[in-house]
Amino acid sequence: EATNARAARLRAKIASDTSLAAIQTKREQLPVREFKDAILNAVRANQVVLVAGSTGCGKTTQVPQYVLDDAWANGRGASIVCTQPRRISAMTVSERIANERGESIGQSTVGYQIRLESRVSADCSLLFCTSGVLLRRLTSEASDTLCESLTHIIIDELHERDLFADFLTIILK
């Protein structure tokens, strides 16, 4: 019920705000939009999905929102963690997505957590963090409850391999 209410509030906000409607129009024009249904079908049917596309096609900003909105549309809650290779990326991508959704970072469904800084609300459904932050969370004593609460883990920019991302993929395997 709460999930449907959140989705309805977002739709109403977009419908009543011309600047948000303009942002939604631009989102619809991104190249990744053409593959939205295929991506969501793959996510629903598989435990692991690899999404590849050219730089700027919208993978980073749109795929997490597609997954979140799909969960809400189907009456399911979502707890999505999306890793970024750098702290600045985790911060800027989360701010961009919050802006696209007409929300304030850390006071909405979108937040970020980096080393020594966290902007996350109790309603956060889409958390951006570095690979290192997620790795530490998964290897902590509370990792069992964390794993049970997460619905999706998105590792962005995996081709930019580093030690944290390599260990993260091993642990998730």
Which residue stretches match the model-derived regions?
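Interdomain "pre-motor" coupling segment immediately N-terminal to P-loop NTPase/helicase cores
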Residues: E1-A15
